[in-house]
Amino acid sequence: MRSDIAPGGTFPDYALPDHTGTVRTLSELQGRDPMILTLARGHYCPKEHQQHLELAAFQPKIAVAYTQVVTISTDDHHTLQEFRASVGANWTFLSDPERIVQRDLGIQEYTDPDHDPMIPHTLVLAPGLMVHRVYNGYWFWGRPTTGELWRDLRDVTSQIRPDWDLAAPGLRAAWDAGDHSLFHGWDRRPDND
């Protein structure tokens, strides 16, 4: 992995086709929320299958916490669709059969010349694609548990949401004064001018 892809760095804003064939950027998919990004070997790998099954089971909690999930795989379009369906994922999968991400990040898994995959990584990104945490998943035990992801996402969310602690000084006064700009969701309502 490139040395700049570390906590505090910015992850590249790749533009790749999703499982429907639509080209999407990571920043578009992330919006202003935290994001879990998996860089996957592909559908053929049982370790990927297991990790993504666990993420799919965790996904309802991820969704209610205003967090995004994206998987980038070297699979072609059809195989990518099968991968996504086989694990019951309802988040965006991006296809990179040209291995743009693999080459740019320097994560070719050279021990598998048959498939030429990426070394698997899971990243937790703060808004703006800012790297909070990087997990190297070449070995399965290097991949994060849902408990570790929960802790990482708690850290990121507490840093980016001014209304994380409603008892914080000034929040109640701002709310009572009609200033909802510090309150997630309320800050985007049309009546918050």
Question: What do the predicted segments below correspond to?
Answer:
Residues 1-193:
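Chalcogenol-based redox active-site neighborhoods
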